[in-house]
UniProtKB/Swiss-Prot annotation:
Keywords attached to this entry: Lyase, Molybdenum cofactor biosynthesis
Gene this protein is translated from: moaC
Pfam families: MoaC
Positions of disulphide bridges: none
Organism field: Geobacillus thermodenitrificans (strain NG80-2)
GO biological process: Mo-molybdopterin cofactor biosynthetic process
Keyword Transmembrane helix: no
Gene Ontology MF annotations: cyclic pyranopterin monophosphate synthase activity
Binding-site residues, substrate: 75-77, 115-116
The family this protein is said to belong to: Belongs to the MoaC family.
Protein name: Cyclic pyranopterin monophosphate synthase
Top-level lineage group: Bacteria
Amino acid sequence: MSSFTHFNEQGRAKMVDITNKEDTVRVAVAKTSVTVSEEIYEKMTNNAIEKGDVLAVAQVAGVMAAKKTADLIPMCHPLMLKGVDIAFSWENEADAYKLVITATVKTKGSTGVEMEALTAASVCALTVYDMCKALDKGMIIGPTYLVEKTGGKSGHYRRKTD
């Protein structure tokens, strides 16, 4: 495990200097989920949520969040993203339904896009919660995690279990 690089000689936080890092294609995939009641599932899949098309709004929110990551996370570098994609799928559980959210972010640059993918997935989930909370505040968000990342000096990472 490498040492932390976000501290200066005085032990204070700093933004890491990435000037000399090589530009490479970098991709990160993150996942999260929102577990909802049957009522919310039925209304979402029939586009009957009063606030509108939940998945369409969540998708746009996720893309916007990826682009704003550096504004939210203090030592995150502002990046020129080349692509952001959000995918949704449903998993049925015993007495609930799980919306699985997958965010994929891509760039060509000198630092990775893991935080952008995690932020995109998280804001998607928060948007789903916001749009459905009038029906049930008991929705569960998470877990949220990095599935895979490619590019850069540290190379390829793939989560062992997904």
